[in-house]
């Protein structure tokens, strides 16, 4: 799809080009109480009051998400007008904007419209300018058009008719909106990669598949890729990671991707993604119902790869390192057993009380490995705990950090990106739950505050740099009829890096 930006001040009569320009459809907003948006007023005047008459006749009442097509409207160049209900004007919000935009795209995608003029980005969203509206609209469109059919015998290769979208924006926002459009496309491409990796079955998206994906990213985007195999992982004494991997016939991989957008001496931001390509629970076997969704236990890895792809496409002036420890967690005669004690790369011994708490066992060695980069910050991303779903549901990602400044940056990025996160506690008192009679610490801390104690475990291996942990167990994928990977938290991570890069 092609996206272009044009400045237009509807209040100053500069909309002639939009009124007379040829397109298949122009999209206008209508508030409840028969109130037209600025663009709709101009179109209504050019059409000699047709829009007003349609509203007064009750064909569209302005309720949020309602849509109505008008055909062959005189006085304008577009062959159709799409009216979109915006709800109550005094209650118009970011969520209302997103809902209206989603309704518009769904209506348009059900037609053979090829070129659209889109005016909704200029709507008065509190604390937002046109550039934000453009970015949100592009991401919404890409989300609506995403489909995963690669594994079907007859994949759906059809593309939507919609090819060209012209956004009208406030003239003062035109430059920023062009940047926002490019960032949105890069971000959507990164999210699509994350979703594709998550949606692939575990017999396809293996650790080796993830490693090959990283190598392809390096080739396509000028990154440096280091993929460490079993012997190299053993040489690094990552025995905690290997204790999880040994129960599977699939060989483990330790992936390191480097993106250099700043001076070589500049400290990088390191992203660490959990890459359990299938999690059976190991000897502490999970229930059979819903176990198919454990292919999504590598969504942390997928989001890290998707983020670095987006960063490379944006060309951000920042250095980023992506680390992915990846393996399967399977039951076998040589698999981890409850009560086993393993030694981490850091040297701390860990009593494995539950083999289904394996994510922290692979992440702890990756967090130790990250020290060699002398990072500006380290953020790990993992589908780590069901307890986080109990605490936060499926809307907010769990955020843990002892660094208030870093946590604040991530929360700001989450709000800007519309990819919400919620900070949870990481008090030292919770560490007591991880005490072991036989090792330096246990890999679980009991049922109370399960997501907190998991983060506390990781914090023991992240003491030498600013660190944050994102628990995406509730936000990385959806179940039910809409089952599939979401692409989160790529928007949050990318926005954090955009902000860090000053882009």
Curated annotation (Swiss-Prot):
Cite the cofactor comment.
Binds 2 manganese ions per subunit.
Residues annotated as binding Mn(2+) 2 are: 274, 279, 297, 358
Predominant place of localization? cytoplasm
The record's section on InterPro entries has: Leucine_aapep/pepB, Macro_dom-like, Peptidase_M17_C, Peptidase_M17_leu_NH2_pept, Peptidase_M17_N
Q: Which residues does Mn(2+) 1 bind?
A: 279, 356, 358
The EC number of this protein is 3.4.11.1, 3.4.11.10
Q: What is this protein called?
A: Probable cytosol aminopeptidase
Q: Which organism is it from?
A: Burkholderia thailandensis (strain ATCC 700388 / DSM 13276 / CCUG 48851 / CIP 106301 / E264)
């Amino acid at each position: 799809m092609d996206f272009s930006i044009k400045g237009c001040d509807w209040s100053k009569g500069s909309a002639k080009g939009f009124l007379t320009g040829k397109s298949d459809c122009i999209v206008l907003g209508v508030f409840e109480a028969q109130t037209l948006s600025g663009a709709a007023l101009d179109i209504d005047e050019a059409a000699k009051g047709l829009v007003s008459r349609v509203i007064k006749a009750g064909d569209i009442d302005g309720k949020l998400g309602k849509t109505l097509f008008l055909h062959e409207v005189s006085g304008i160049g577009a062959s159709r007008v799409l009216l979109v209900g915006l709800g109550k004007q005094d209650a118009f919000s970011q969520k209302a904007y997103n809902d209206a935009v989603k309704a518009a795209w769904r209506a348009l995608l059900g037609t053979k419209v090829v070129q659209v003029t889109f005016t909704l980005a200029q709507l008065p969203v509190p604390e937002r300018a046109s550039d934000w509206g453009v970015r949100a609209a592009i991401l919404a469109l890409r989300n609506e058009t995403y489909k995963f059919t690669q594994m079907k015998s007859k994949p759906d290769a059809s593309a939507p008719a919609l090819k060209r979208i012209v956004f009208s924006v406030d003239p003062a926002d035109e430059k920023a909106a062009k940047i926002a459009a490019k960032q949105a496309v890069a971000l959507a491409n990164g999210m699509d990669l994350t979703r594709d990796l998550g949606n692939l079955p575990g017999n396809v998206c293996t650790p080796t598949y993830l490693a090959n994906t990283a190598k392809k990213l390096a080739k396509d985007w000028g990154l440096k890729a280091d993929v460490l195999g079993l012997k190299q992982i053993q040489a690094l004494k990552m025995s905690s990671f290997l204790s999880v991997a040994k129960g599977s016939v699939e060989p483990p991989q330790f992936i390191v991707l480097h993106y250099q957008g700043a001076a070589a001496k500049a400290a990088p931001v390191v992203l660490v993604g959990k890459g359990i390509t299938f999690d059976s629970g190991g000897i502490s076997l999970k229930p059979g119902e819903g176990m198919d969704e454990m292919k999504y236990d590598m969504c942390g890895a997928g989001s890290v790869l998707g983020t670095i792809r987006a960063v490379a496409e944006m060309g951000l002036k920042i250095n980023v390192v992506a680390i992915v420890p990846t393996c399967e967690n399977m039951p076998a005669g040589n698999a981890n057993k409850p009560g086993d004690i393993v030694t981490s790369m850091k040297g701390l011994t860990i009593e494995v009380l539950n083999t289904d708490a394996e994510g922290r066992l692979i992440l702890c060695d990756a967090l130790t490995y990250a020290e060699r980069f002398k990072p500006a910050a380290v953020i790990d991303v993992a589908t780590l705990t069901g307890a986080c779903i109990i605490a936060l549901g499926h809307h907010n990602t769990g955020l843990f950090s002892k660094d208030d400044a870093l946590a604040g940056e991530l929360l700001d990025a989450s709000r800007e990106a519309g990819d919400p996160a919620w900070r949870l506690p990481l008090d030292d008192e919770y560490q007591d739950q991880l005490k072991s009679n036989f090792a330096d610490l246990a890999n679980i801390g009991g049922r109370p505050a399960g997501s907190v104690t998991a983060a506390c475990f990781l914090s023991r291996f992240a003491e030498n740099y600013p660190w944050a942990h994102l628990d995406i167990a509730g936000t990385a994928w959806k179940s039910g009829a809409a089952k599939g990977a979401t692409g989160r938290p790529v928007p949050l991570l990318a926005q954090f890096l955009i902000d860090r890069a000053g882009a």
